[in-house]
């Protein structure tokens, strides 16, 4: 039996890539799409909804969300309230929101996934960085994205820093008496690590984790050149959350 999928934010680039992935997978069935700014009532013979409230009681299994940070939390909670297992690629959630959604998913007996990055290579980068941080506590992150991305730093960079902080010796990176001649020149501070965000046209999603030690350096890098790189992870997420009973944060928990 096919997994019935709703895609919120289907008009965006990630939403369009997700729609094409679902439409070409015989195990998935795209039953509805959501976008508040769409003027048509159908898209490729699929019903279009402008208001998520109209989807209450709709028959579907999974809610895929590629919207905006401003509405992602409300959308995810709405999905859980209505029996849809959420697969969320929108970033910008606070740790408190994630904890609340995890608890609510358990109460609803529904699986779910919030993933800062759906590219398998990016997930591996985070795992490699976590291993390296045990031995190289001096580390900085540079994340680079297209200039339409609304949040900084990226969810992937934050997740990478969180994972490294769990195993890394907590030290302040840089000189103890350093001075920023221009505010923000050293980037954002996360547990003593620095995170730098680059936003330029022509980029998609890229991240470097740079480690330094006496006389040596180690650089880990992942590049997504096309949004199709995320679709393997989205497909995996859709097929896994219907088997689960709790929302997880990070694709690595489903691998």
UniProtKB/Swiss-Prot annotation:
Keywords in alphabetical order: Amino-acid biosynthesis, Cytoplasm, Diaminopimelate biosynthesis, Lysine biosynthesis, NAD, NADP, Oxidoreductase
Record-given protein name: 4-hydroxy-tetrahydrodipicolinate reductase
Superkingdom of the source species: Bacteria
Any single GO BP term: diaminopimelate biosynthetic process
GO cellular component, one term: cytosol
InterPro entries tied to this protein: DapB_C, DapB_N, DapB_N_CS, DHDPR_bac, NAD(P)-bd_dom_sf
CDD domains given in the database record: DHDPR_N
Primary location class: cytoplasm
Binding site for NAD(+): 9-14, 35, 89-91, 115-118
Functional note: Catalyzes the conversion of 4-hydroxy-tetrahydrodipicolinate (HTPA) to tetrahydrodipicolinate.
Top-level EC class as recorded in UniProt: oxidoreductase
Ligand binding ((S)-2,3,4,5-tetrahydrodipicolinate): 146, 155-156
Entry-linked Pfam families: DapB_C, DapB_N
Family per record: Belongs to the DapB family.
Reactions performed catalytically: (S)-2,3,4,5-tetrahydrodipicolinate + NAD(+) + H2O = (2S,4S)-4-hydroxy-2,3,4,5-tetrahydrodipicolinate + NADH + H(+); (S)-2,3,4,5-tetrahydrodipicolinate + NADP(+) + H2O = (2S,4S)-4-hydroxy-2,3,4,5-tetrahydrodipicolinate + NADPH + H(+)
Pathway listed: Amino-acid biosynthesis; L-lysine biosynthesis via DAP pathway; (S)-tetrahydrodipicolinate from L-aspartate: step 4/4
GO molecular function, one term: oxidoreductase activity, acting on CH or CH2 groups, NAD or NADP as acceptor
Subcellular location: Cytoplasm
Keyword Amino-acid biosynthesis included in the entry's annotation: yes
SUPFAM superfamilies the record matches: Glyceraldehyde-3-phosphate dehydrogenase-like, C-terminal domain (SSF55347), NAD(P)-binding Rossmann-fold domains (SSF51735)
Keyword NAD: yes
Lineage: Bacteria, Bacillati, Bacillota, Bacilli, Lactobacillales
Catalytic residues as annotated in Swiss-Prot or TrEMBL: 145, 149
């Amino acid at each position: 039996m096919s997994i019935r999928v709703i895609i919120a934010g289907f008009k965006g680039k990630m939403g369009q890539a997700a729609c094409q992935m679902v439409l070409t997978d015989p195990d998935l069935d795209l039953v509805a799409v959501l976008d508040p700014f769409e003027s048509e009532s159908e898209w490729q013979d699929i019903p279009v909804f402008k208001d998520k409230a109209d989807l209450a009681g709709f028959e579907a299994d999974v809610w895929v969300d590629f919207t905006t940070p401003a509405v992602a939390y409300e959308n995810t909670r709405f999905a859980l309230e209505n029996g849809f297992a959420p697969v969320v690629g929108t970033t910008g959630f606070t740790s408190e929101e994630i904890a609340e959604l995890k608890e609510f998913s358990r109460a609803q007996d529904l699986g779910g996934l919030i993933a800062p990055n759906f590219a398998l290579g990016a997930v591996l980068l985070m795992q490699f960085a976590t291993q390296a941080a045990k031995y190289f506590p001096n580390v900085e992150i540079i994340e680079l994205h297209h200039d339409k991305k609304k949040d900084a730093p990226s969810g992937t960079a934050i997740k990478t820093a969180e994972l490294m902080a769990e195993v890394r010796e907590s030290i302040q990176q840089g000189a103890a008496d350093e001075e920023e001649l221009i505010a923000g020149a050293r980037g954002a501070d996360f547990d003593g690590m620095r995170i730098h965000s680059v936003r330029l046209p022509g980029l998609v999603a890229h991240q470097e984790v740079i480690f330094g030690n006496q006389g040596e350096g180690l650089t880990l890098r992942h590049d997504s050149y096309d949004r199709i790189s995320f679709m393997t992870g989205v497909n995996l997420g859709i097929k896994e959350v219907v088997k689960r009973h709790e929302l997880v944060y990070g694709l690595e928990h489903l691998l």
